[in-house]
Curated annotation (Swiss-Prot):
Catalytic activity field: 7-carboxy-7-deazaguanine + NH4(+) + ATP = 7-cyano-7-deazaguanine + ADP + phosphate + H2O + H(+)
Name listed for the protein in its UniProt record: 7-cyano-7-deazaguanine synthase
Keywords: ATP-binding, Ligase, Metal-binding, Nucleotide-binding, Queuosine biosynthesis, Zinc
EC numbers on record: 6.3.4.20
Pathway(s) it belongs to: Purine metabolism; 7-cyano-7-deazaguanine biosynthesis
Molecular function terms from GO: ATP binding; ligase activity, forming carbon-nitrogen bonds; zinc ion binding
Function (record text): Catalyzes the ATP-dependent conversion of 7-carboxy-7-deazaguanine (CDG) to 7-cyano-7-deazaguanine (preQ(0)).
Keyword ATP-binding: yes
Similarity annotation: Belongs to the QueC family.
Residues binding ATP, per UniProt: 16-26
Listed NCBIfam families: 7-cyano-7-deazaguanine synthase QueC
Keyword field contains Zinc: yes
Length: 228
């Protein structure tokens, strides 16, 4: 993977949750744009666990990145899902989306990020969505991102290329590889939060933990074989 392609004449904002994917994107953005040209935007959408926001804040402070927190918790009043209901049991029924899917979340995030970017003179928006190793979320697909790009350009008359989706076609193992190539695999493993249950270090049982740990194990196995 070619990950170092300095683009220091532009500014970018990373949609940042404090999870593995968005943190990897943040590190890649720093390498590509320079830390002084990067900002992070985080959304409080009514997620069931505060640890997600705490991790995002801590990482942004640790890296010296300006972080903007936007409250979109009104979503709890108009939609229901397991990510915003502490009492809900996380599950996925056959031929249905997982009940962790938040209707309209990524569309809303991109809209607010675009509004902020235009106001700050930021050219690029980076998001860690991926359609390779994902749970079937329709708003993680490349076709959706491209559609939002067109929609926002038309709505705001501002050429924001939301096409910055560096993880779109990477497996979870390849995302770990990218973190390793950036020299931050240990940091991402130690400091990011992915667990749907909000457990520090992960519950190892929820779909998100399983995908994360399976990807890490696969990458480390492949890396070990190459080093033999």
């Amino acid at each position: 993977m070619n990950i170092f392609n300095p683009n220091h004449d532009r500014k970018a904002i990373v949609i940042f949750s404090g999870g593995q994917d968005s943190t990897t994107c943040l590190f890649q953005a720093i390498a590509e744009y320079g830390k002084e040209n990067i900002e992070a935007i985080t959304f409080q959408y009514g997620q069931r666990h505060a640890i997600e926001l705490e991790k995002a804040r801590t990482i942004a402070q640790d890296l010296g990145i300006k972080q903007t927190l936007i409250d979109t918790s009104v979503m709890k009043a108009i939609t229901h899902n397991a990510l915003m209901d502490e009492q809900a049991h996380i599950e996925q029924k056959e031929n249905e989306l997982p009940n962790t899917f938040v209707d309209g979340r990524n569309a809303l995030f991109l809209l607010y990020a675009a509004i902020y970017a235009k106001g700050q003179g930021i050219q690029d928006i980076i998001t860690g969505v991926c359609e390779t190793d994902f749970s079937g979320y329709p708003d993680c697909r490349d076709v959706f991102i491209k559609s939002m790009n067109v929609t926002l350009n038309l709505a705001m008359d501002y050429p924001i290329p939301i096409s910055k989706t560096p993880l779109m076609y990477l497996t979870k193992a390849q995302t770990w590889q990218l973190a390793d190539e950036l020299g931050v695999l240990d940091y991402v493993q130690k400091h990011t939060h992915t667990c749907y249950e909000g457990i520090e270090g992960g519950c190892r049982k929820c779909p998100s933990c399983i995908l994360r740990n399976k990807g890490l194990k696969k990458y480390l196995t492949q890396k070990g074989r190459k080093n033999v």
